[in-house]
Amino acid sequence: RIMYPAGPEYFGHYADAFRQAGAALVGGCCGTTPGHIRAMRTALDHPPKKSGNGNGAVRIIERPEEPAGPDSGSRLAEKLRAGVFVTAVEMDPPRGLSTHKLLAGADLLSEAGASVINVADSPMARMRMSPWGVCGLVQREVGVETTLHFPTRGRNLLRVQGDLLAAHALGVRNVFVVMGDPTAIGDYPEAMDNYDLAPTGLIRLIKQGFNTGVDHSGSEIGQPTSFHVGAALNLAPPDLKRELQLLKRKLANGADFFLTQPVYDPSVAKAFFETYSAGNGDVGKPILVGILPLFGTRHANFLHNEVPGIEIPDAIRARIEAAGSDGPKEGVRIAIELIEAVRPWAQGVYIIPAFGRYDLAAEIIEAIK
């Protein structure tokens, strides 16, 4: 049995209030009784007299949507469309409240000529400040555009969409969609690791949903977002066929640009795109090649042997070993050489400084201007 808890008098009062607000038809549904209907009929036939300052219908004043403005879009997208060779640099959010080092690093990179700052989200599943807050802070305090790393792992649909709206409200327009690192390797291995969307699905949600003014359920969100969406790409994958299929799906779902895993052998990267083009045609979207400056022999050996998707040629590892204590300087020289090698076919580079050495990234940017 369905019960309606409110009494007839209350029901009748609001029936008349709805009439005054403009309702053309008022009725009772599940749980209402004949007494409720009689009270409604009486209230509608004999409305109470209005006093001079009585409550009437609520007047709703709609504020016009704020204009998008000339700077609401992605400046990174504009540069890529114009054929500018762009430089993106990854930064990690702080582990606490202090942002002095972060902002100083962003300012250094901006002065060197970085096109955009990429802000990572909980790299290696370590607890850090939320990246969309960092993006807003860097853009406001330093004035350099940012790209928000947006992993799907650990987010349900509610949080995904809420975080996207928050980022857009803070002025973030570039989003780099990734799966994210599993919590098992980080600070809280027992933390929930569930997700509702894979990266390909999130790309579709943003480009075919939010950027058209609707959410995942098809409900309107008002003014459409204007996100410029990047996707991840591994140019030396353990399963080439699967990576090629993922690339095709990401393109079909609307990816605007791609950031690759660190590259140390340009010929391998070029071969990947030749293989894709042979069966699918040109990728047709900007590629920003990952550049991770080597810091020393241990660093190079770790990346080569323990990080999936990264292969460092023997010749480069030999150079780093021979450099000894000058390993960081040799790493910068190798990075500059790699950038010059990919410049003819890439639309930019994505520099990932090791151990927070933003000064080395700035040196690389200065050298390739």
Predicted regions and their residues:
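Domain-level signal for soluble alpha/beta catalytic cores
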Residues: R1-K369
